[in-house]
């Protein structure tokens, strides 16, 4: 299913999330199972299925990584269950530096400053990746779609590392 069509958007990485939320509420009202309470069982089942599609579509389009994965899947590139790893040596080196910095936080003289520094480093790198991804996803070239898939893999890794950093920060606050 093309969630961009469902929500009446052109396939694009940058979307108006406020408009997405508005269209989500409209679709929810239109397909909500309560609206079909007095209809046939088949109609009720269709309503439940349609509601699930609307919910999944909304969750997919509101999350930048899932949105990019969806755009790539519409072009025949499936990333959701893959095990392909990033081959960019520069990124792999940066990844190792981040991991080391993450491990060193607990022994730091100022753990919060170290955490803030890592968050800032993540934000800068993520902004660069997102800018490149936006450009690659607007291209019609098959090679650019493969490069976009690599950017998504990097963003997925960064999201996991960001979650780890948040857990470390939470543990320090406890």
Swiss-Prot record:
Protein's UniProt name: Co-chaperone protein HscB homolog
Please describe what this protein does: Co-chaperone involved in the maturation of iron-sulfur cluster-containing proteins. Seems to help targeting proteins to be folded toward HscA.
One of the protein's GO biological processes: protein folding
Q: Which Pfam families match?
A: HSCB_C
An example molecular function term from Gene Ontology annotations = ATPase activator activity
Please report the organism this UniProt entry assigns to the protein: Shewanella baltica (strain OS223)
Alphabetized Gene3D superfamilies for the sequence = DnaJ domain (1.10.287.110), HscB, C-terminal domain (1.20.1280.20)
Task: Kindly indicate whether the keyword Chaperone belongs to this entry.
Answer: yes
Which family, according to the similarity comment?
Belongs to the HscB family.
In this protein, which residues make up the domain named J? 2-74
Q: Which InterPro entries match?
A: DnaJ_domain, HscB, HscB_C_sf, HscB_oligo_C, J_dom_sf
- Describe the subunit structure: Interacts with HscA and stimulates its ATPase activity.
Keywords from the UniProt entry:
Chaperone
Q: Which gene encodes it?
A: hscB
Q: GO CC annotations?
A: iron-sulfur cluster transfer complex
